[in-house]
Every structure is written in structure tokens, then in C-alpha cells.
Amino acid sequence: RYIGSPKVKETDRIRGFSEAEMEQMDRTGIVKDVRDNTIFLTFDDWGTDASINHLLYVLRKHHAKGTFFIITWNVKNNPNLLRAIAEDGHDIASHTNRHRPMVWQTSNYGGNMTPMTEEEYAEDVRLSYEELQKTVGDVMVDGKPALTHYFRPPTLAISKSGIRSIMDAGFSY
């Protein structure tokens, strides 16, 4: 299920979908079936050890939980930090392995990177989940796995072939 924003109709943010398919997408950004007054805290990418540890301290202090969308290329530098995030009770989700965009926009990264093929993107998504599984796949929090099947695309832009890669890899959101 795609949960997006009103910007999903901008042609440089979405590729390969027909008008009818785009009309069926949830562009409200609202997650259904949650309690009133629920706030979702989500964190993308990866930071320094110091910044992540400070963030974990603040979340612990306020008894708050979040979802961390992880660029797994960075996990190799400190897998124990990812385990600490999971063991603190936060959901772990994928933000790809290399943070390469699914849809190429001229504004992405100043145009310094080349887009990936559909096969390369599928491999990047697969590698991302594999690294997360290897690092935190055994962590359980309150009886449920810390590792989720959530995915957030870099730059939040999507394409039909990218969505196919994500769903084929077993992601649900």
C-alpha cells in the first residue's frame, strides 16, 4: 500500500502510472486504523554515532518510539548501533542500500549521479532487506519483530517499476 502526499501527481515525482492508476493512490498521507492523537515519528537515512545516540536518548527520555528508515550501506560501519535502535523498541525499515532514487529528477543530487536500471534497483532493494535481516532480524520487541516490511523511497519519488521491485522484495508499505 502506498501512503503518499498530494505531490504524488507531479510528473517528475512519479513515473509509469496511468492517470487511472494515479487516481487510486492514497495521497492523503493518512494511516488508517490508528488511535486518535497518534503521531508517527520517522527518521530517514543514517547519521553519526553521536547524533543517533543523542536521538535515542531523547526518545527514551520521553518514552517515544519511532520508525527508522535505514540506508543499509551505512550499517556496515556500526551494526551495533542499528541493533541498539531495534532493541530500544523502534521499528526498523528500509530506505534502500545506496539511497539511489527510484525516479530520476534533474534536481536530485545536483545531477551528479546516473539512474539505476530496473534490475539494479531491484538488487539494491534486495540487498537492503538482506542487510537489515542479518543485523536485526532476530530482535523482537513486545512479541513482534523490530524489522518491518516498510519501505520509504529516496526523495519520496516513485515509479511503477520501482514499486514492482519493492513489492517483489516482500515490502508491504
Task: Show the residue positions of the predicted features.
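His/Asp/Glu-enriched short active-site or ligand-binding loop at hydrolase and phosphoryl-transfer sites
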Residues: 162-173
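Active-site beta->alpha N-cap acidic-glycine motif
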Residues: 2-116, 127-149
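Surface-exposed acidic loop/strand-edge motifs in secreted or periplasmic proteins
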Residues: 120
